[in-house]
Amino acid sequence: MKGNVLIMAGGTGGHVFPALACAREFQARGYAVHWLGTPRGIENDLVPKAGLPLHLIQVSGLRGKGLKSLVKAPLELLKSLFQALRVIRQLRPVCVLGLGGYVTGPGGLAARLNGVPLVIHEQNAVAGTANRSLAPIARRVCEAFPDTFPASDKRLTTGNPVRGELFLDAHARAPLTGRRVNLLVLGGSLGAEPLNKLLPEALAQVPLEIRPAIRHQAGRQHAEITAERYRTVAVEADVAPFISDMAAAYAWADLVICRAGALTVSELAAAGLPAFLVPLPHAIDDHQTRNAEFLVRSGAGRLLPQKSTGAAELAAQLSEVLMHPETLRSMADQARSLAKPEATRTVVDACLEVARG
């Protein structure tokens, strides 16, 4: 092995999945990858399954915490810093890559105190608290979307690391001529109940002759009631609690209605898919709206704020594009033009460049 690399990412799939893509690239180049996470995040399931050693530190966020937690926070942060220092001194990594989550704060500071080159990557169009704090001390600051960070010599716009099988060329789908449009509705692994309620009502108002084929991922807790909503309004739909093969789902789809998480937006570009984007209204710093605007500005997507989009409005917008397939083709081309197939390699290149000094 050429040396150890320490990846820091935790909490949600939006941080962990891009980090796993980077881990595979490091391994392909002959490096041993270790992972720094927290005991409660999704990394506790995904990282061991990927065969990577997972080191845990105790750290949590401060937003929305009560006075008692805030008083205890400095001691807890100091404890997590010492835990991260211990891991880094044990591993002696050639570089540390942080992709977000609470773990990256103490982990990034520990890297700096140990003189280990630090690279950070921000998946969203608005930088998270940890990455904003670490940007001044990082050797490279990678961003998925342009201008997330202030301009500097160390800023690098890379895109988001996305699984290679999601990248589809313009000929991967059957032509739209002579068939129904395929509509994919995604609410994330837990489902998005506002979408589960809105879509059946809206699609019932779309004329039958242009109504799309529907595949709706509703979440495990909401799949049965969502299917019943479709039956109630006499709309045929394939409702699933979860979609495990996203590559196949994207290859089937012609249009997607979904939230605007950073990874979802990047996957839409990779798959060359037009989208109606309904950002999560309570996302921190409204980052999902900013993510969505990346597609909307280029004509690859339409922004539908949850608070102001009713069934009639959604039905009208759907009917417009369903009656004019050339609009969907144009949106798909624009989405494909935004894809960053080299994102994973670019992030890893940046890490190894600073590791070499």
UniProtKB/Swiss-Prot annotation:
First-level EC class: transferase
GO molecular function: UDP-N-acetyl-D-glucosamine:N-acetylmuramoyl-L-alanyl-D-glutamyl-meso-2,6-diaminopimelyl-D-alanyl-D-alanine-diphosphoundecaprenol 4-beta-N-acetylglucosaminlytransferase activity; undecaprenyldiphospho-muramoylpentapeptide beta-N-acetylglucosaminyltransferase activity
NCBIfam families noted in UniProt: murG
Protein name per the record: UDP-N-acetylglucosamine--N-acetylmuramyl-(pentapeptide) pyrophosphoryl-undecaprenol N-acetylglucosamine transferase
GO cellular component, one term: plasma membrane
This protein's pathway: Cell wall biogenesis; peptidoglycan biosynthesis
Record's keyword annotation contains Transmembrane helix: no
Catalytic activities: di-trans,octa-cis-undecaprenyl diphospho-N-acetyl-alpha-D-muramoyl-L-alanyl-D-glutamyl-meso-2,6-diaminopimeloyl-D-alanyl-D-alanine + UDP-N-acetyl-alpha-D-glucosamine = di-trans,octa-cis-undecaprenyl diphospho-[N-acetyl-alpha-D-glucosaminyl-(1->4)]-N-acetyl-alpha-D-muramoyl-L-alanyl-D-glutamyl-meso-2,6-diaminopimeloyl-D-alanyl-D-alanine + UDP + H(+)
Residues reported in the UniProt entry to bind UDP-N-acetyl-alpha-D-glucosamine: 12-14, 124, 163, 189, 243, 262-267, 288
Domain of life, per lineage: Bacteria
Family: Belongs to the glycosyltransferase 28 family. MurG subfamily.
Membrane topology of this protein: Peripheral membrane protein
Transmembrane segments annotated in the record for this chain: none
Gene3D superfamilies: Glycogen Phosphorylase B
Primary localisation category: membrane
One Pfam assignment: Glyco_tran_28_C
Organism: Pseudomonas paraeruginosa (strain DSM 24068 / PA7)
UniProt function note: Cell wall formation. Catalyzes the transfer of a GlcNAc subunit on undecaprenyl-pyrophosphoryl-MurNAc-pentapeptide (lipid intermediate I) to form undecaprenyl-pyrophosphoryl-MurNAc-(pentapeptide)GlcNAc (lipid intermediate II).
Enzyme Commission numbers on file: 2.4.1.227
